[in-house]
UniProtKB/Swiss-Prot annotation:
Record bears the keyword Transferase: yes
Organism: Ligilactobacillus salivarius (strain UCC118)
Protein name: 4-diphosphocytidyl-2-C-methyl-D-erythritol kinase
GO BP annotations listed: isopentenyl diphosphate biosynthetic process, methylerythritol 4-phosphate pathway; terpenoid biosynthetic process
Protein family: Belongs to the GHMP kinase family. IspE subfamily.
Active site: 10, 137
Pfam families: GHMP_kinases_C, GHMP_kinases_N
Residues reported to bind ATP: 95-105
EC assignment: 2.7.1.148
Enzymatic class: transferase
Amino acid sequence: MEISEKAPAKLNLSLDTPFRHQDGEPEWRMVMTAIDLSDYVHIKTIPNSKEITVQTNTGFLPCDQRNLAYQAAKLLQSKLDKPEGVEIEIDKHIPVSAGMGGGSADAAAVLRGLNKIWNLNMSREELAKLALTIDSDVPFCVYSEPALVTGRGEKITPIGPLPPMWLVIAKPQASVSTPTILRQIHEQHLNHQEVQNVVSAIKQQDFDKMCRHMGNALEPITMKKCPDIIKIKDKMLQFGADAAQMSGSGPTVFGISQKKSRATHIYNSLRGFCKEVYLVRALDSLTTK
Protein backbone atom coordinates (compact mmCIF):
# COMPACT_ATOMS: atom_id res chain seq x y z
CA MET A 1 0.00 0.00 0.00
CA GLU A 2 1.05 3.61 -0.39
CA ILE A 3 0.02 7.01 0.89
CA SER A 4 1.20 10.64 0.66
CA GLU A 5 1.35 12.92 3.68
CA LYS A 6 1.81 16.68 3.95
CA ALA A 7 4.64 17.67 6.33
CA PRO A 8 4.29 21.36 7.30
CA ALA A 9 7.19 23.41 8.66
CA LYS A 10 6.90 24.91 12.13
CA LEU A 11 7.72 28.29 13.63
CA ASN A 12 8.23 29.27 17.26
CA LEU A 13 6.27 32.37 18.25
CA SER A 14 7.74 32.06 21.73
CA LEU A 15 10.56 29.86 22.99
CA ASP A 16 11.99 29.49 26.46
CA THR A 17 14.02 26.83 28.25
CA PRO A 18 13.71 27.50 31.99
CA PHE A 19 16.04 24.69 33.12
CA ARG A 20 17.85 21.50 32.16
CA HIS A 21 16.88 18.06 33.42
CA GLN A 22 19.44 15.90 35.22
CA ASP A 23 20.15 14.02 31.99
CA GLY A 24 21.05 17.31 30.30
CA GLU A 25 17.91 17.60 28.17
CA PRO A 26 16.25 21.04 28.15
CA GLU A 27 12.83 21.72 29.61
CA TRP A 28 10.83 23.59 26.96
CA ARG A 29 8.08 26.18 27.05
CA MET A 30 7.15 27.13 23.50
CA VAL A 31 4.29 28.48 21.44
CA MET A 32 4.45 26.81 18.04
CA THR A 33 2.49 26.92 14.82
CA ALA A 34 2.61 25.03 11.56
CA ILE A 35 2.75 27.02 8.32
CA ASP A 36 1.77 26.38 4.72
CA LEU A 37 5.34 25.67 3.62
CA SER A 38 5.50 21.89 3.48
CA ASP A 39 7.47 18.86 2.44
CA TYR A 40 5.49 16.03 0.88
CA VAL A 41 6.25 12.51 2.07
CA HIS A 42 5.30 9.52 -0.07
CA ILE A 43 5.21 6.21 1.81
CA LYS A 44 4.95 2.72 0.34
CA THR A 45 5.00 -0.55 2.27
CA ILE A 46 6.72 -3.63 0.83
CA PRO A 47 5.38 -7.07 1.88
CA ASN A 48 7.77 -9.74 3.16
CA SER A 49 10.61 -7.28 3.72
CA LYS A 50 12.21 -5.45 6.61
CA GLU A 51 14.17 -2.97 4.51
CA ILE A 52 13.61 0.77 4.97
CA THR A 53 14.77 3.14 2.25
CA VAL A 54 14.65 6.94 2.01
CA GLN A 55 15.02 9.06 -1.12
CA THR A 56 14.93 12.84 -1.33
CA ASN A 57 15.09 15.46 -4.06
CA THR A 58 18.03 17.18 -2.37
CA GLY A 59 21.62 16.16 -1.75
CA PHE A 60 21.77 17.94 1.59
CA LEU A 61 20.06 15.20 3.61
CA PRO A 62 21.25 11.79 4.78
CA CYS A 63 19.08 8.92 3.54
CA ASP A 64 20.23 6.37 6.11
CA GLN A 65 19.60 5.81 9.83
CA ARG A 66 20.45 9.46 10.52
CA ASN A 67 17.31 10.60 8.70
CA LEU A 68 14.42 11.20 11.12
CA ALA A 69 11.87 9.83 8.63
CA TYR A 70 13.88 6.58 8.53
CA GLN A 71 13.91 6.50 12.33
CA ALA A 72 10.14 6.98 12.46
CA ALA A 73 9.53 4.04 10.12
CA LYS A 74 12.00 1.86 12.03
CA LEU A 75 10.36 2.79 15.34
CA LEU A 76 6.89 1.64 14.29
CA GLN A 77 8.19 -1.36 12.36
CA SER A 78 10.19 -2.62 15.36
CA LYS A 79 7.60 -1.80 18.02
CA LEU A 80 4.83 -3.61 16.16
CA ASP A 81 7.04 -6.31 14.61
CA LYS A 82 5.59 -5.58 11.17
CA PRO A 83 6.86 -7.95 8.43
CA GLU A 84 6.84 -5.15 5.86
CA GLY A 85 9.52 -2.88 4.50
CA VAL A 86 8.96 0.83 3.94
CA GLU A 87 9.96 3.01 0.98
CA ILE A 88 9.96 6.73 1.77
CA GLU A 89 10.30 9.46 -0.83
CA ILE A 90 10.58 13.04 0.46
CA ASP A 91 9.82 16.00 -1.78
CA LYS A 92 11.68 18.73 0.13
CA HIS A 93 10.51 22.34 0.22
CA ILE A 94 11.36 23.27 3.83
CA PRO A 95 14.88 24.72 4.18
CA VAL A 96 17.40 22.34 5.76
CA SER A 97 19.10 23.15 9.11
CA ALA A 98 16.93 26.23 9.45
CA GLY A 99 15.12 25.90 12.80
CA MET A 100 11.84 25.11 11.02
CA GLY A 101 11.55 21.44 11.93
CA GLY A 102 11.79 20.01 8.42
CA GLY A 103 13.24 16.67 9.51
CA SER A 104 10.78 16.42 12.39
CA ALA A 105 7.87 17.22 10.08
CA ASP A 106 8.95 14.41 7.74
CA ALA A 107 9.20 11.96 10.66
CA ALA A 108 5.73 12.94 11.90
CA ALA A 109 4.35 12.44 8.39
CA VAL A 110 5.78 8.91 8.33
CA LEU A 111 4.19 8.14 11.71
CA ARG A 112 0.80 9.42 10.53
CA GLY A 113 1.07 7.63 7.20
CA LEU A 114 2.04 4.24 8.62
CA ASN A 115 -0.64 4.62 11.28
CA LYS A 116 -3.15 4.72 8.41
CA ILE A 117 -1.56 2.09 6.14
CA TRP A 118 -1.16 -0.44 8.94
CA ASN A 119 -4.57 0.38 10.49
CA LEU A 120 -2.98 0.96 13.89
CA ASN A 121 -5.71 3.36 15.06
CA MET A 122 -3.23 5.15 17.32
CA SER A 123 -4.40 8.50 18.67
CA ARG A 124 -2.39 11.70 18.20
CA GLU A 125 -1.46 11.47 21.87
CA GLU A 126 -0.08 7.95 21.42
CA LEU A 127 1.84 8.92 18.28
CA ALA A 128 3.24 12.02 20.00
CA LYS A 129 4.48 9.94 22.95
CA LEU A 130 6.32 7.63 20.55
CA ALA A 131 7.55 10.60 18.53
CA LEU A 132 9.51 12.04 21.45
CA THR A 133 12.02 9.18 21.16
CA ILE A 134 12.94 10.51 17.70
CA ASP A 135 13.31 14.26 18.34
CA SER A 136 11.75 16.88 20.61
CA ASP A 137 9.96 18.65 17.71
CA VAL A 138 8.31 15.52 16.29
CA PRO A 139 5.43 15.39 18.83
CA PHE A 140 4.31 18.90 17.82
CA CYS A 141 4.62 18.01 14.16
CA VAL A 142 2.25 15.08 14.71
CA TYR A 143 -0.35 17.71 15.68
CA SER A 144 0.76 20.57 13.39
CA GLU A 145 -1.62 23.15 14.83
CA PRO A 146 -1.07 26.19 17.11
CA ALA A 147 -0.09 24.83 20.52
CA LEU A 148 1.70 25.37 23.80
CA VAL A 149 4.52 22.83 23.93
CA THR A 150 6.08 21.98 27.30
CA GLY A 151 8.14 19.30 29.02
CA ARG A 152 10.74 17.77 26.75
CA GLY A 153 8.49 18.53 23.79
CA GLU A 154 5.92 15.80 24.43
CA LYS A 155 3.21 17.88 26.16
CA ILE A 156 1.10 19.43 23.41
CA THR A 157 -1.80 21.73 24.35
CA PRO A 158 -3.68 23.12 21.32
CA ILE A 159 -4.55 26.80 21.83
CA GLY A 160 -6.83 27.55 18.88
CA PRO A 161 -6.22 29.56 15.71
CA LEU A 162 -3.78 32.47 15.57
CA PRO A 163 -5.03 35.99 14.90
CA PRO A 164 -5.20 36.60 11.12
CA MET A 165 -1.71 37.38 9.85
CA TRP A 166 0.85 36.86 7.10
CA LEU A 167 4.38 35.63 7.72
CA VAL A 168 7.54 36.39 5.77
CA ILE A 169 10.32 33.86 6.30
CA ALA A 170 13.96 34.45 5.40
CA LYS A 171 16.83 32.01 5.84
CA PRO A 172 20.40 33.33 5.91
CA GLN A 173 22.91 31.44 3.81
CA ALA A 174 24.53 29.96 6.91
CA SER A 175 23.18 26.80 8.52
CA VAL A 176 23.19 26.11 12.24
CA SER A 177 23.58 22.86 14.17
CA THR A 178 20.83 22.57 16.78
CA PRO A 179 22.93 20.37 19.14
CA THR A 180 25.72 22.96 19.02
CA ILE A 181 23.32 25.72 20.08
CA LEU A 182 21.68 23.63 22.81
CA ARG A 183 25.05 22.70 24.33
CA GLN A 184 25.63 26.40 25.01
CA ILE A 185 22.39 26.99 26.94
CA HIS A 186 24.03 26.37 30.32
CA GLU A 187 26.89 28.73 29.42
CA GLN A 188 24.61 31.68 28.72
CA HIS A 189 22.39 33.92 30.81
CA LEU A 190 19.13 33.50 28.92
CA ASN A 191 16.47 36.16 28.63
CA HIS A 192 13.46 34.12 29.72
CA GLN A 193 10.34 34.69 27.67
CA GLU A 194 6.74 35.53 28.61
CA VAL A 195 5.34 32.42 26.97
CA GLN A 196 2.01 32.42 28.82
CA ASN A 197 1.31 35.99 27.68
CA VAL A 198 1.63 34.85 24.07
CA VAL A 199 -0.81 32.00 24.75
CA SER A 200 -3.28 34.44 26.33
CA ALA A 201 -2.97 36.87 23.42
CA ILE A 202 -3.70 34.12 20.90
CA LYS A 203 -6.74 32.92 22.83
CA GLN A 204 -7.95 36.54 22.98
CA GLN A 205 -7.15 37.04 19.27
CA ASP A 206 -5.10 40.07 20.35
CA PHE A 207 -2.51 40.49 17.59
CA ASP A 208 -0.76 43.52 19.14
CA LYS A 209 -0.37 41.83 22.54
CA MET A 210 1.01 38.73 20.84
CA CYS A 211 3.62 40.82 19.02
CA ARG A 212 4.68 42.58 22.23
CA HIS A 213 5.37 39.34 24.08
CA MET A 214 6.95 37.21 21.35
CA GLY A 215 10.55 36.17 21.90
CA ASN A 216 13.15 33.42 21.56
CA ALA A 217 15.61 32.72 24.37
CA LEU A 218 18.03 31.00 21.97
CA GLU A 219 18.30 33.99 19.65
CA PRO A 220 21.31 35.69 21.34
CA ILE A 221 23.28 32.42 21.21
CA THR A 222 22.68 31.80 17.51
CA MET A 223 23.24 35.47 16.60
CA LYS A 224 26.88 35.14 17.68
CA LYS A 225 27.36 32.43 15.06
CA CYS A 226 25.18 34.07 12.41
CA PRO A 227 25.19 37.91 12.56
CA ASP A 228 22.89 38.04 9.52
CA ILE A 229 20.01 37.22 11.87
CA ILE A 230 20.02 40.72 13.37
CA LYS A 231 20.41 42.27 9.92
CA ILE A 232 17.37 40.41 8.59
CA LYS A 233 15.32 41.26 11.68
CA ASP A 234 16.20 44.93 11.33
CA LYS A 235 15.27 44.92 7.64
CA MET A 236 11.94 43.24 8.32
CA LEU A 237 11.04 45.83 10.95
CA GLN A 238 12.30 48.63 8.70
CA PHE A 239 10.06 47.40 5.87
CA GLY A 240 6.99 47.33 8.13
CA ALA A 241 6.81 44.03 10.03
CA ASP A 242 4.84 44.24 13.28
CA ALA A 243 7.31 41.81 14.89
CA ALA A 244 10.34 39.80 13.78
CA GLN A 245 12.35 37.06 15.45
CA MET A 246 14.33 33.88 14.94
CA SER A 247 12.57 30.50 14.89
CA GLY A 248 13.84 27.54 16.89
CA SER A 249 17.61 27.33 17.11
CA GLY A 250 17.82 29.36 13.90
CA PRO A 251 19.04 30.78 11.74
CA THR A 252 15.69 31.37 9.98
CA VAL A 253 13.99 34.68 10.80
CA PHE A 254 10.33 35.47 10.33
CA GLY A 255 8.36 38.70 10.35
CA ILE A 256 4.61 39.04 10.72
CA SER A 257 2.02 41.50 9.47
CA GLN A 258 -1.76 41.67 9.59
CA LYS A 259 -1.83 43.13 6.08
CA LYS A 260 -1.02 41.05 3.02
CA SER A 261 0.10 44.16 1.11
CA ARG A 262 2.69 45.00 3.77
CA ALA A 263 3.84 41.39 4.02
CA THR A 264 4.25 41.30 0.24
CA HIS A 265 6.35 44.49 0.43
CA ILE A 266 8.58 42.90 3.08
CA TYR A 267 8.88 39.74 0.99
CA ASN A 268 9.86 41.63 -2.17
CA SER A 269 12.30 43.86 -0.29
CA LEU A 270 14.14 40.89 1.22
CA ARG A 271 14.50 38.86 -1.96
CA GLY A 272 17.59 40.81 -2.95
CA PHE A 273 19.16 40.19 0.46
CA CYS A 274 18.35 36.50 1.01
CA LYS A 275 18.17 33.65 -1.46
CA GLU A 276 15.48 31.78 0.47
CA VAL A 277 12.46 33.99 1.22
CA TYR A 278 8.86 32.81 1.60
CA LEU A 279 5.46 34.44 2.07
CA VAL A 280 3.18 32.09 4.01
CA ARG A 281 0.24 31.80 6.37
CA ALA A 282 -0.18 29.83 9.59
CA LEU A 283 -2.15 26.58 9.56
CA ASP A 284 -4.99 26.08 12.03
CA SER A 285 -4.76 22.33 11.46
CA LEU A 286 -3.38 19.77 9.01
CA THR A 287 -6.57 20.11 6.96
CA THR A 288 -6.21 23.89 6.57
CA LYS A 289 -5.67 24.82 2.93
